[in-house]
Amino acid sequence: MADERIHVLRDILLELHNGASPESVQERFDATFAGVSAIEISLMEHELMNSDSGVTFEDVMELCDVHANLFKNAVKGVEVEDTEHPGHPVRVFKDENLALRAALIRIRRLLDTYESMEDEEMLAEMRKGLVRQMGLVGQFDVHYQRKEELFFPIMERYGHDSPPKVMWGVDDQIRKLFQTALATAKSLPEESISSVKETFEAFATEFESMIFKEESILLMILLESFTQDDWLQIVEESDAYGYAIIRPSEKWVPERQSFVEEKSAEEPVQLDTAEGQVQQVIDTPEGQFTITFTPKEKESALDRHSQQAFGNGYLSVEQANLILNHLPMEITFVNKDDIFQYYNDNTPADEMIFKRTPSQVGRNVELCHPPKYLDKVKTIMRGLREGTKDKYEMWFKSESRGKFVHITYAAVHDEEGEFQGVLEYVQDIQPYREIDTDYFRGLE
């Protein structure tokens, strides 16, 4: 039955893809599905994008709004303990959306009042207020970054890799619409108020549609899939990205036994005896019995502090880690299988040029970047893998951060010349650009 439902959902989107109107499939959808789970939506998109049906990622992006409208009145909710706690990621996510929607309402009121206002002094103040409110709405980018960098990697681990790809593409479209709306608003009074309203509504329509998709589809997938530990990981890593308009009023700390305590309560009791033997008490329906045995020696864990041959000298794992974390640059390593395997920890996450968090480790490098950059990522990886280039360099000036960022992507080869992966190192070279002397010892 589940397969049939997924196939029907697939057929509906294929019909829309081939030109059918939403109205023509709405009745069939309503008649077939009394309620549809977010997991089925995810499976459907995954099947469409990974089958020979001819539907591509771009096609699903085009269908995204129609898809959302079809499910607007048919998505089943999922209740999970603690999601209404002020610090739970779900509550934080919804509170941000509420604050962002309130800012949209204020902007609409400002634009309507501006249109009928004749007092030039008041108009000037309203223009300042409009830019301030647009700045508040612009914080949605932080909300999107947390979604893309913290939620999406965990979704992919559970096999839901298609929804993140589609939603990230739409997020980027919304970002573009906002930049256009902001630039037009800042151009008042040279730009007409009608142009400002038009560009703002083009953004707001898509933005409000995304809020629906987040709360009625995305969060449902997360609530059905994520464990309590997944949510805790998101809580721990969220501060690195920040929050939109409002911050959590308190930290979410779930009430539960630790998994270690639960596990130990279920395991048989072990008692140490003389001469290295162990007695184990085992419960059975008929009663308890005790066995005595000598455990095998376990292989010792890697000693992080013991010296190992390392390049032209000796280092412990701990020393190597400290050295990498003290380098004045951000380092990322992607292995030969295109898996993001490592990044160093030389600066607080919220100060990183390119933010990295533990949840991203183990992710395919193509999924670590917005869809709009996918072709560039593939070009770099292919060029370094095939040896057409040893490294790629790029740089840009970030006025907002006061940094001049230099990036290098270098191929990593072993002693036999075999490709082992790509090393990315990123540094702020602005301090070096400001050097204006030929000589300096730094000892004074």
Regions found by a protein language model. Give the residues of each.
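Small-residue-biased structural context
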Residues: 1-141, 145-392, 396, 403-405, ...
